[in-house]
């Protein structure tokens, strides 16, 4: 809506300054439309720069249980991890999402086509004294403060814009956490 107002006010400002013949009416109309145009541009710039009209919202979601990445012949439950980068605490985690799933799958693999979004997402793990493993996702995003701001500033799907997303997989102390290299060694040693 604000972009449409800017386009319309640009045309009105042009017409006010160049097409109105009366000097007094031209100054008043031209100044008013120019001030309205400047305020619309300022509002759009403030929204793009400092998210004017928006507020951060945090949602925490504890989702499904997870199941061991190891074969059923191994007595311990396994979580296989692979660190992304050398110093980051960001991981690709390999586990099963259902007990009947035949092969474990990697989760939290960054999307190389959406790098701006991928850099805002992190996944890690921790071992704690819990009974069941779980996945907890904390998501922070920009949302409009009211319907007025949403109507005024919505363009390019900027509502629910991601600030950060942190996912933590919590496993019991009885689980073994292995790197991908360690998991390969265990797989070679395990009888089929």
Question: Can you name each region flagged by the protein language model?
Answer:
Residues 1-23, 27, 42-46:
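Membrane-embedded alpha-helical segments of integral membrane proteins
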Residues 26-34:
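Membrane-interfacial entry segments at the cytosolic side of transmembrane helices
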Residues 33-56:
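Transmembrane alpha-helices and immediately adjacent membrane-cytoplasm interface residues
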Residues 55-56, 73, 82, 158-160, ...:
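Generic structural signal for short, flexible, solvent-exposed coil/loop and linker residues
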Residues 67-91:
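Short extracytoplasmic
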Residues 89-192:
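Extracytosolic and intramembrane catalytic regions of membrane-associated proteins
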